[in-house]
Each structure stands twice: as structure tokens, then as C-alpha cells.
Amino acid sequence: MGNCLKSPTSDDISLLHESQSDRASFGEGTEPDQEPPPPYQEQVPVPVYHPTPSQTRLATQLTEEEQIRIAQRIGLIQHLPKGVYDPGRDGSEKKIRECVICMMDFVYGDPIRFLPCMHIYHLDCIDDWLMRSFTCPSCMEPVDAALLSSYETN
Amino acid sequence: PLGPLPPGWEKRTDSNGRVYFVNHNTRITQWEDPRSQG
């Protein structure tokens, strides 16, 4: 009948202690009970950027000016509010059920980002989109110029 | 200081800026720093 009901052996207990002591000795910036680390990849994928919506360039091929513009764009995106999808709340999540970028339904707990026009998208989906075009995919409204000027004066 | 990584290990950062470690021999990845595992 197998030994699924076997009592914990000393090995099991030591394993338990071992995993706890592992947690105490973590490298910087890692959270113990997070999802598994990224899968193994021979080479670190070189980030690809889009100086203009129609152009695709390796990070290593960007001009200095493009690098500055992209860094500014990343800075602006980080300024946009983000949250977690919760259909129960009264916010815009109540109405919007699907991320129009990936066409997938929002699921409770999904990381989302709000645009000034209050349209919401999956965080990863909209961040990718905004790197190419700094407008709302739904209403095409440019991301609030106020956001731009407040970022540049800081 | 922890000193150099053991042979075959590489330190990487994921898209969220979290540090993880890659072993090219066993092709595994882990959050824990191999140098602190004794």
C-alpha cells in the first residue's frame, strides 16, 4: 500500500531545518518563498528596444541619444500608478475585465498599471506597449503631458 | 566578503531586478547564493 503515511524520519526534519537555514543565508534582493527563479538559459538575452514603433534594435546598438530617450521613457513609465487587479473594488477594474493587449481576462491578483485615462492593462503588457508608443492602446490618448513635464522638472 | 562564485556558477538579475544564480554544469537556477550554502 506504499508508505504515504510513514512517520517523518530524522532526514525529513533535518531537511526542514536545512531549508530554513538556507532562507537565512540568501543573496541580496531575493525573496525566499517567491516563485521559482527564471529557467536556465545559456546566454543572458540581450534586451531589444524600439527607438521608433517600426524600429527594433539591440540594446548594444543604440546611439547615446536613443539610450537617453529610452531611459527617460522607462522613467516615465515607472511614474504611472500600478496596482493589483481586484474586481471587487469600485475602481475601473469593475468595468474592464480583459487586457486588450494580450486579449486575456484579468485574474484577481494580476499586477496591473493604470494610465491617466484610467484604462488598465497587465503591467508587463502595457510597459512593453509604452516603450513603443506612449499612448493608450484603447483610446489613443497620449499619456498625460503633465506626467511628462512633472518628470522633467524633477 | 563572499569571494568568487564557485566554478560553473553565474550571478544574474531577472526582469524585476532580483538576483539569482545559474549553474552552467547542472543547468539549474536558484535564488540562493551558492557561496552561502557551504
From Swiss-Prot, chain A:
One of its GO terms (molecular function) is DNA binding. Expressed at low levels in the lung, liver, kidney, pancreas, spleen, prostate, thymus, ovary, small intestine, colon, and peripheral blood lymphocytes, and, at intermediate levels, in the testis, heart, brain and placenta. Highest expression in the skeletal muscle. In the brain, expressed at different levels in several regions: high levels in the amygdala, moderate in the hippocampus and thalamus, low in the caudate and extremely low levels in the corpus callosum (at protein level). Residues 1-12 have a biased composition (Polar residues). The keyword Chloroplast does not apply. Transmembrane segments: none annotated. Changing L16A: Loss of GGA1-binding. A lipid is attached at G2 (N-myristoyl glycine). CDD domains: RING-H2_RNF11. Keywords: Cytoplasm, Endosome, Lipoprotein, Metal-binding, Myristate, Nucleus, Palmitate, Phosphoprotein, Ubl conjugation, Ubl conjugation pathway, Zinc, Zinc-finger. GO terms for biological process: protein autoubiquitination; ubiquitin-dependent protein catabolic process. Essential component of a ubiquitin-editing protein complex, comprising also TNFAIP3, ITCH and TAX1BP1, that ensures the transient nature of inflammatory signaling pathways. Promotes the association of TNFAIP3 to RIPK1 after TNF stimulation. TNFAIP3 deubiquitinates 'Lys-63' polyubiquitin chains on RIPK1 and catalyzes the formation of 'Lys-48'-polyubiquitin chains. This leads to RIPK1 proteasomal degradation and consequently termination of the TNF- or LPS-mediated activation of NF-kappa-B. This is RING finger protein 11. It comes from Homo sapiens (Human).
